Amino acid sequence: MAQKKGGGSTRNGRDSKPKMLGVKAYGGELISAGSIIVRQRGTRIHPGVNVGVGKDHTLFALVDGHVSFGTKGALSKHTVSVTPA
């Protein structure tokens, strides 16, 4: 005979791993070509000069240089550019 009641079950026993999003290289930093500048969901920050966009909207440097953040256009879209060093 069981000495304890059954534990039952739950539907909540899992969690997703963190996605590590955010800015990886800040303004003024010297980075190399291919370095990730921003990991994001959607284009919260738009690519500027010498910056490429990955299929998951990750922004990365196309050339070696210094990172600079700014705004562009009438709606003040946030942009990131790389100035060649």
Swiss-Prot record:
GO BP of this protein: translation
Record key words, sorted: Ribonucleoprotein, Ribosomal protein
Segment forming the signal sequence: none
Region annotation Disordered: where it falls in the sequence: 1-20
InterPro entries xrefs: Ribosomal_bL27, Ribosomal_bL27_CS
Ranges of biased composition (kind: Gly residues): 1-10
Gene Ontology MF terms in the entry: structural constituent of ribosome
Disulfide bonds: none
Origin: domain of life: Bacteria
GO cellular component: cytosolic large ribosomal subunit
Family designation: Belongs to the bacterial ribosomal protein bL27 family.
Protein name (record): Large ribosomal subunit protein bL27
Phylogenetic classification of the source organism: Bacteria, Pseudomonadati, Pseudomonadota, Betaproteobacteria, Burkholderiales
